[in-house]
Amino acid sequence: MKYLISFLFLALAFSMKSEAKVTLPSILGDNMVLQQQAEVKLWGKARSNATVTVKTSWNGQTYKSSSDGKGGWSLTVSTPVAGGPYKIIFNDGELLTLQNVLIGEVWFCSGQSNMEMPMGGFDRQPVRGTNDIIAKAKPSTPIRMYTTDSKDGRWVRQFSKTPVEDCQGEWLENTPVNVSHISAVSYYFARYIQEVLEVPVGIVVSTWGGSKVEAWMSRESIKPFSSIDLSILDNDAEVKNPTATPCVLYNGKIAPLTNFAVRGFLWYQGESNRDNTDLYLNLMPAFVADLRAKWGRGELPFYFVQIAPFNYEGADGTSAARLREVQLQNMKDIPNSGMVTTMDVGHPVFIHPVDKETVGNRLAYWALAQTYGMKGFGYAPPVYKSMEIQENKIYINFDNAQRGLSPMWTSLKGFEIAGEDKVFYPAFAEIETTTARLAVSSDKVSHPVAVRYAYKNY
């Protein structure tokens, strides 16, 4: 797929859907999914100072708005319970009709390359088990996909120093070709909740490999962090590295979409922020709070993925472990959030793990339990609660372990224990059969004071 780099001072203020006077942003188009049972905003351009009418086929109702002197207009429509397909007819004297519109559940998915990685994989980097799913994809399955940067098989990487009104993208049906190009984690998530909820599902995907969270933050949200230089946003300097430049991905790939109603957010990012985990600890809550404020729909759920093990280069080999520790704290600090663990899907030499199904499904468990109120299955990982020291052992208690602990391997790996000298040694860990706690010990530490788990990159 050909990649073009575009610095977005968008001349395409709104992408054309036809030769009609009414024009719409790319996120409003044929094949889209609108959030069910919601007040949904529709907006666009028309002739200046004109009356714009919008008729929705699900209720036969006509809504009216007046365009301003520059032709901008917006209005809000009420959506019913999940269903479709429907039509939406826009009219400012000339008609524009959107076809094949579904009503269902919509999720916004963002992050860096592990969220971006498509079902068809990257070059020489496959995604395990997707070939059969891609081949069997059918338009009759009510999953619809929108990806920024992508249209007609071409990619235009979009970023901007200032917020823009529109971005390139299009809604696509569930066909083999389309599924092969969509984010694998997002698609597995959508596939799972669609099968369970039995409603249409739309995923809006906005990603860029190698990106720092700073690039995805708005100027308002990042301004309080005085250590971050924002001067490039105000001068004529060229943005040479958009993935590390504050605000430019927000401006080009999130700002144009904040009017579009969603149920919640999915996020898979962090690898590129290992160099300053203390800053990341504070950036993430600010980022999430700002996303929610920009969408203006209350405390929308935010489910994210803890980065997977990988042998990053580094002097001490613990930068990823520190980032994972910060991400755990993020889950505790950010209300209405949940974190998916990936300690069992990483690979020492492939930064893009081949198992995206496990990740997508685990995100779905969070959503089904916390957003949709389902019960009877596990969704949250065991999390450290407390510890007790008895003789030469440390006993660890966990939250989210009501049914006990179950190891992936025959013996537990990754535990280390230390005495007063704070020198950590590999430790033996075993699950107590009658409780949801671990006993950890080492023959090299007779009086332990500290224990840690998986505190290395891989």
Where are these regions (language model features)?
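Cell-envelope and extracellular/periplasmic
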Residues: K21-Y458
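Bacterial Sec-dependent N-terminal signal peptides
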Residues: M1-T23
